[in-house]
Amino acid sequence: MEDAGQNPLDDEAEITEIPTLEAIKQNLKYLNSDLEKDLQRLDEANQILLRKIQKKEESIQSLERDIALSIGRVPERDDFNEILAQKETALKDLELESAKLEKKNKTLSKNVMELQKKISKGLKNIASDPETLKKKVTEFKVKLQKSTESCAQQEKEIAKMESDYQSVFQLCEDQAHYIKKYQEILREMEKEKEVMLLEKEISKAQNDSSQVVKPGSTLVETIQSNMEKNIIKKQKRKFWLRHFRYLFFMVMIVIRLLGYVFFHLQYVNPDFLVDTLPMLMSRSSLKWLRDILFPFLTLEVEDVLPH
């Protein structure tokens, strides 16, 4: 009788546990769907962030190229160098931060994928024990809280990085604007210099024409003649400079060859001339050369010797 009284109670407990288990399964399914949605959102946010980072890196690289080109044309100054060094360090720091954030995104995506796999395995291997289900639900909740916290931190870091990129981009734009203005000022100064030089040449030509006036000559002819004279002078100067360079290099080569010959005759083969001259010259020419060089090669030691 007691067994018969206990069996219906167990059946009633099992009947009450079945809907709870079904509710837990449904909750797990909802949690899995929410996790998948969060993962999709994270992937979309990561892709958007990567696109923004690539666009900003491309714009920063283009600005760096423009700045490098403008600096190659503009004379170097300490202020520009300091500003560019600061911006380069800031860009390097931002690139390091972006690399760190990309690594964090990769680790987060891996963790989320592992969570998905674990959830799918847990749904397949759901046990009938409510205690294990409750433990798994609590574990999933803890993991969800951790993932949401990490996502919030990542969003904060992304917002901070975007603000830093915007500030650096604005600074680069300002720098490029100032460099363009500086180039325009330099061009205007060069134009003014050219105008001044032309005015000086015209004044010289006018003075020359006022001092010596040729019959039928005009101011334009005098200016043309002066310009032709200047061009001829420049061409002559270039011609003489070119020939002077060639002459200088030839003299240097001859001096070096003479040095090599002297070294060879002094240290390597001192008897070279004695051996080769009889083969090249006749006896009469050798005698004549000996008579000429004999006074220079003999040593006068009579005054030095003791009496």
From Swiss-Prot:
Disulphide-bonded residues: none
Keywords: Coiled coil, Membrane, Transmembrane, Transmembrane helix
InterPro entries: SMCO2/5 (IPR026617)
Transmembrane annotation, as ranges: 246-268
Gene Ontology CC, one term: membrane
Superkingdom of origin: Eukaryota
Coiled-coil blocks: 20-212
Membrane topology: Single-pass membrane protein
Subcellular locations according to the entry: Membrane
PANTHER family cross-referenced by the UniProt entry: TRANSMEMBRANE AND COILED-COIL DOMAIN-CONTAINING PROTEIN 5B (PTHR22422:SF1), TRANSMEMBRANE AND COILED-COIL DOMAIN-CONTAINING PROTEIN 5B-RELATED (PTHR22422)
Family as reported in the entry's similarity comment: Belongs to the TMCO5 family.
UniProt-recorded name of the protein: Transmembrane and coiled-coil domain-containing protein 5B
Gene source species: Mus musculus
